[in-house]
Amino acid sequence: MSADIQIPENLKPRDGRFGCGPSKIRPEALAALTAPGANYILGTSHRQKPVKNVVKSVREGLTSLFSLPDGYEVILGNGGSTAFWDIATLGLIEDRSQHLVFGEFSSKFASASKEAPFLGEPTVIKSEPGTHPEAVAEAGIDVYALTHNETSTGVSMPIKRPAGTDGALVLVDATSAAGGLDVNAKEFDTYYFAPQKSFASDGGLWLALMSPAAIARSEKIKASGRWIPAFFDLSIAIENSRLDQTYNTPALITLMLLDEQVKWMNANGGLKFAAGRSADSASRLYGWAEKTSYTTPFVTNPAQRSNVVGTINFDDAIDATAVAAALRANGIVDTEPYRKLGKNQLRIGMFPAVDPADIDALTASIDFVVSKL
């Protein structure tokens, strides 16, 4: 059985976590949870200064990391990106939206807006898994919904405002992209994500980098009288975020780990540093896949390959499931493919916390496993 294969210790990565979310958390960040002063935060009120100072640090850190233009704000709340699809449906789409769909997760927001009884029919532009479509300027569209990185397939797309769409908002699902891929904030109105990917924390929180136009849209929709449940009310989240707090109680460890990761990124050179680490890892993974006889990158167009989520197809003669099982038995975990894609492949998380040298060790470990199958 593949699980009986023993990979030599000298081949293994120093850290065997390659998941696409939850992802590797740096040991230094975990240590910060028990550092002097942490006990004044954990187990205390999120309405008081110790916790509010953490939220403030996160908001200021993300403003710096993404070089946000004047007027842009960092807004946060509970529920993760899944909640934000509903929040945006209720509070940012005025009537009609256009969605680019090229995988499981980019389809979720499209489904939410399509099912909303108070919105007009959305336009959905699809492409095959392993590719991404392009936005098209369209009359009557007030939100263009893009996805920076499709986590299920390992496809990334450049974020740029579609030409001829003045007055419409550009909303970007950056769940697995934020912090690991470069982006220009002037090209979006809302860039939303969760902290369990590049930001090496736990899930359950959403964060949104919002332009003045997006905030104004939220205020306009709220004033229109549209019924919005309080938990999904973006105006309430904005109001609380400006006070460095969330509407309801957040997971404090999640906030603290997020804060540690943002500080680490900024201290080492900001987004250029963080995205550079992921790019280095991706270069090693795809370079190995292209030169290895039994593997090929799933995304055939190099320009569309993700630097944070790598999907690698295996020759039909090799069962990628068996490879993943052998890796897991050796402490190298979460390399399994996205379940609904149905491909004979591995999916590798290459977020900034992952040491690029560990990607080399991972590929050496895969080669060893395949040689023993």
What are these regions, as identified by a protein language model?
Residues 296-326:
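Conserved PLP-binding catalytic core of the aspartate aminotransferase-like
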Residues 82-142:
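PLP-dependent aminotransferase-like
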Residues 15, 340, 344-373:
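PLP-dependent enzyme catalytic core of the Aspartate aminotransferase-like
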Residues 24, 196-286:
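Active-site C-terminal subdomain of aminotransferase-like
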Residues 185-196, 206:
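Conserved active-site segment immediately N-terminal to the catalytic lysine
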Residues 37-87, 108, 112:
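Conserved N-terminal alpha-helix of the aminotransferase class I/II PLP-enzyme fold
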Residues 1-45:
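N-terminal "arm"/small-domain region of PLP-dependent enzymes with the aminotransferase-like
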